[in-house]
């Protein structure tokens, strides 16, 4: 028959192992895990994605224009993904109507398709 010291040691070891396994399993859903994950994501720099052919004409930061020198049009929406478009006054006159029709076609399709899915 094992001694009481051996039984207590085995019992303590099994409790410690169960606690370690429980902590490892619960850390996935714990709030502390989410905080660590948010800290890791915040270290990544925000990237500005622009096609190479269009660089320099989308915003005043690229061409060195002073803010407020021209009328500007800015369109921004976020329906499955974030979309933002900035146009100067001349660009708005030139591309505004086709861009408006394009956005209307896209948004109108989603409005007409949404009730059909329900």
Swiss-Prot record:
It is found in: Secreted. GO terms for biological process: actin polymerization or depolymerization; decidualization; dendrite development; gastric acid secretion; negative regulation of apoptotic process; negative regulation of endothelial cell proliferation; negative regulation of inflammatory response; negative regulation of insulin secretion. A lipid is attached at residue 27 (O-octanoyl serine). A lipid is attached at residue 27 (O-decanoyl serine). The lineage of its organism: Eukaryota, Metazoa, Chordata, Craniata, Vertebrata. The keyword Transit peptide does not apply. Its main location: secreted. Residues 1-24 form the signal peptide. The modification Leucine amide is found at residue 99. GO terms for cellular component: axon; extracellular region; extracellular space. This is Appetite-regulating hormone.
């Amino acid at each position: 028959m094992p001694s009481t010291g051996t039984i207590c040691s085995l019992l303590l070891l099994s409790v410690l192992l169960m606690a370690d396994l429980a902590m490892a399993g619960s850390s996935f859903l714990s709030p502390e895990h989410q905080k660590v994950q948010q800290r890791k994501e915040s270290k990544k720099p925000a990237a500005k994605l622009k096609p190479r052919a269009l660089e320099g004409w989308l915003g005043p930061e690229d061409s060195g224009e002073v803010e407020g020198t021209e009328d500007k049009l800015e369109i921004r929406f976020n329906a499955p993904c974030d979309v933002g478009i900035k146009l100067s006054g001349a660009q708005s006159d030139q591309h505004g109507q086709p861009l408006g029709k394009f956005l209307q076609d896209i948004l109108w399709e989603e409005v007409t398709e949404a009730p059909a899915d329900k």
